């Protein structure tokens, strides 16, 4: 799994999302993670996390939710702000616009919020 457009489309088009809309969200995420002020939550971090996710596929309840949570988990990064909540809200908005199933959106939001210090790290384990 990587951050390429083809992989993103494979995940997001599975529920019938419009390709152009999927491409626009992907471009937004790539731009966010490529910003010059990114030192840790950048594209290399996302690619690394996606690679790790591929190694634990058999231990994950919903791999699509995990992939999406990885892509969105810290896409919004503002110093001194609740980045997990902001990123979860953004993911919810964008995935809803892409017509993702509500249950999937809720899992993605829960996974993103689990990255907050003190969050539930077992939210997607089998």
Task: Tell me what each language-model feature is.
Residues 20, 58-62, 120-124:
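Structural motif
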Residues 22, 26, 46, 63-68, ...:
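Short runs of predominantly hydrophobic/aromatic residues within well-ordered alpha helices
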Residues 35-66, 90-99:
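Alpha-helical phosphate/pyrophosphate-handling elements in metalloenzyme active cores
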Residues 49, 64-78, 87, 110-116:
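His-Asp-centered metal-binding catalytic motifs of divalent-metal-dependent phosphohydrolases/nucleases
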Residues 82-92:
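Post-HEXXH active-site segment of zinc metalloproteases
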Residues 101-126:
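Histidine/acidic-rich helix-loop-helix segments that form or flank divalent-metal centers
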């Amino acid at each position: 799994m990587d951050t390429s457009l083809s992989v993103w489309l494979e995940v997001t088009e599975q529920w019938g999302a419009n390709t152009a809309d999927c491409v626009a969200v992907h471009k937004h995420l790539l731009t966010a993670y490529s910003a010059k002020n990114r030192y840790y939550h950048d594209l290399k971090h996302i690619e690394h996390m996606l690679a790790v996710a591929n190694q634990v596929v058999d231990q994950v309840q919903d791999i699509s939710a995990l992939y999406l949570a990885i892509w969105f988990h810290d896409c919004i990064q503002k110093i001194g702000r609740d980045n997990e909540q902001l990123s979860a809200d953004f993911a919810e908005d964008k995935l809803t616009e892409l017509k993702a199933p509500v249950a999937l959106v809720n899992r993605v939001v829960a996974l993103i919020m689990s990255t907050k210090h003190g969050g539930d790290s077992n939210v997607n384990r089998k």
